[in-house]
Amino acid sequence: MESVTRHRADMISFFTFDSYISIVGVAYTAVGLLGVFCNVTTVIMILTNRVFRLSAYTIMANVALADSIVMLIAGVACGMDVMWPNPNDLTSFIPSLEEPYQKIAPVSLRNDSKTDSSAAGFETGNIHAVLSFSFVAAWTAGVISYAMLGTNRCIAICYYGTKARALNQVSVAVACSASTWIVGIAAALVGTLSQPMIGIQRTMWSISFLEPRPHTTLFFTLLCAANLLGLGAQWVCSTLVLLKIRQVKKKISKNKLNQNSANRFRKQVILALNEIIVTGNFKARLTFQFFYPSILCTISTFLFFIKPYAFEYLSGWQLVILHLLWLCNHTCNPFIYAYFNDRMRLTYKEILTCAAIRYQIRKRRSSHPFRMHGRHNVSKRSNAAGMKSTRISARSGRTNRDGNFVRNSLQMQSRDFEQLCEFIMRVNPLYDSSEGWRESSDDEPFQPEFTKELESAHNQGGSSRFDSEREAKSIVLDLGRQTVEHWVKFAKKASI
């Protein structure tokens, strides 16, 4: 390698070549480790918490698993190769920095096994073949999982009352997740059966196709078709959800949607998303959650497929920025989950702060409070009382967490219930226990139901007319009964 003081015009002047290599490698590795950590945490959280055993969370776990493998290879492995390249290819990075406008034949790590016939070279080639296979399988499975997640949310919001609702089950989600890996493994076999077609490209500072003309291969066609299918499904589902939100918002604003339909739509959205959505930010949050992830996935896929044809027109730092943007796309999902879902944010906090371990430590200390100091003059009765209080506090802590989850998740229904109570107080301030509730306007004076019953019996000689009128005007109690039934179903579904 030439002198370390070698500079380039489009770099910052105080960066030498070695320092530039170190910064890029550290950035790749740091973002990769962050992505692996966040996505693995998401997988563990969904698998170990019973409250997340729903179809949408199952697909989210599959997406997180695929993203963690992609980040491990494209982030950590690629960053380490940037910092510590093979000794036989030390100058392979220089052409991408020195001559960005000249077409340079790509140099892959697979060449190490071709030029070196020793056992070490053969082992290195096998390692890179395994990395290439894992990357293709995980990336393909992740893209298809995105499409299935969008379909799941679209059914939950737009087609919740139809027979398509049966598709949003945990068993169906597990089967769909397994099918994504079957498709990914099949694509990886095609791409690595004879020799790896995707690997670390040092001339591109990224992972890309090894063939100079990848569009001529069958593997490129299959991979492109799978990605186009996944992106198309994402965009169709996102568009349907946004149109549904816009339609319902317009009807509510024009007072063309009755109360039952509005409540039913709110319940569908809460059951579908299982998250806290403030009424004022309802449309904005759903728009962000369904629209912008599709944009990020589309940009990421476009960058991956266009890079083999555009890298000769880009300089080194531009290729580095593109690769970092690509890595950020596979890292941002846990942050989106934590922002939109209070329950997931609380669980993330418990995992990151080691709440379970700290609880066990406090429990052990409280069960043996004086062992460290050698004091044994505490009676068994007081010790048992302390252990009992610890168990009660632990149960109350879990109850508070579960209660917070139910209370937050049913925030909208609580508002409806408050309006129901206000309506009942307005039309029946005497707390009559009968079901003869009657909707009254603010203009007409209030008249109790028992007075109307007496007048009706006195004038018409019977209560048959009153009974039919009372039966026809029991809308309020029906609404309250439906609300309570919905709460019970939601609590059972959340296993609380």
Swiss-Prot record:
Keywords: Cell membrane, G-protein coupled receptor, Glycoprotein, Membrane, Receptor, Transducer, Transmembrane, Transmembrane helix. Glycans are attached at residue 111. SUPFAM superfamilies: Family A G protein-coupled receptor-like. Residues 451-470 are annotated as: Disordered. One of its GO terms (molecular function) is G protein-coupled receptor activity. Residues 1-19, 80-128, 191-216, 307-318 are extracellular. It comes from the Eukaryota. GO terms for cellular component: plasma membrane. The chain crosses the membrane at residues 20-40, 59-79, 129-149, 170-190, 217-237, 286-306, 319-339. Belongs to the G-protein coupled receptor 1 family. This is Probable G-protein coupled receptor K01A12.3.
